[in-house]
Amino acid sequence: MYVSADLIWLAVALPLAGFLINGALALWRPDAKSAVSVVGPAVLLGAFAVVALIFRSYALAGLATPHVVHLWTWLPAGALSVELSLLVDRLSLVMLMVVTGVGSLIHLFSVGYMRSDPGYARYFAYLNLFVVFMLVLVLGSSLPVLFIGWEGVGLCSYLLIGFWYGDKANADAGKKAFLVNRIGDFGFMVAMFLIWVALGSLNFLEVAELAPRHLAAG
């Protein structure tokens, strides 16, 4: 059965739905641990299944050409038009298998490990959201979209590291991780600016095509 790469958005949408459901339960039904125990891991297993089917289709068809899934134009600003698009190729599919596969195992382990914690639903909401941003980071077809994923992963790292914020050491560790990531943000934004000035594009496929010519021209 051939599964089109156009369906890769489902791999992101499923854990996003898990975040919304578990987030709502954390706010209004924090004691609904049975529902959280099902929703949290199920959305990750579903995402893994979607990725695995697309990976299998790519492998059987011997596809090597990158496939761009356009969702919508995010920033139509003259020459700089940033599209919210997902880039599917062999490398991204391998990384998606890792993210959703390992993520599923972590979610399943957490069902037992975190069961007695009063913030159970909140924890799974954060964990689902962490995977969402990891997938955006891997799938982003341009530097701005990748940057969204990067920022989201940094935010979720802060939330998860400082999850038991009642302990000062955990709260401080979360703040430290958040601040250190801001150093990376600065370098990332400077690099994006320089690439835009030099090549006039932040799209990965366009940059890969333009960069060799730019370097050859000196």
Ranges and model annotations:
Residues 1-218:
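...captures the hydrophobic TM-helix bundle architecture rather than a specific catalytic motif
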